[in-house]
């Protein structure tokens, strides 16, 4: 009886060790593949907000962290520096619209050195399907309405939805969501316009960041 218990215990121990080893080996073998997929995903998003023609560097490796309440979060946000022939051409920066209808909306905006928006994309949201989710490019092209826009003293008040006297469309039955995104993009552009040199001169300390 005692020998049988010992034998069973030894068998279980061997099985546990083998299972643990298999899990560890699987994680080791898939780690590089996961990293590669994350980099591809990040590169795809970055190239939507900063055209490939505008840079010759790897954007996901040219990242710095910035913190400011204008970016809608108390966390440091990544900013990706685009360069061509060693000269800065644009910045893609993540920010948050904290006042979406169903919570925070995470976005990324590409802005060139003249202050022109090259593109904006929604990274994550929890907005209502069929209503607020129209901010998602997979649903409508509304988010592309920021492309080509600039922010200055003369047009600051136009950076609102039409219901509030601005130039951006709201959605039928869903004004809160686009209002939150327009405000967040406006704040982001204003932040970059004000702090561009500071951002460009910071150390690159967050390459490969993606959530």
Swiss-Prot record:
One of its GO terms (molecular function) is FMN binding. It comes from the Bacteria. The chain crosses the membrane at residues 9-29. Its cofactor is FMN. Its EC number is 7.-.-.-. It is a single-pass membrane protein. The modification FMN phosphoryl threonine is found at residue 175. It is found in: Cell inner membrane. GO terms for cellular component: plasma membrane. Keywords: Cell inner membrane, Cell membrane, Electron transport, Flavoprotein, FMN, Membrane, Phosphoprotein, Translocase, Transmembrane, Transmembrane helix, Transport. The complex is composed of six subunits: RnfA, RnfB, RnfC, RnfD, RnfE and RnfG. Part of a membrane-bound complex that couples electron transfer with translocation of ions across the membrane. PANTHER family: ION-TRANSLOCATING OXIDOREDUCTASE COMPLEX SUBUNIT G. This is Ion-translocating oxidoreductase complex subunit G. It comes from Vibrio vulnificus (strain YJ016).
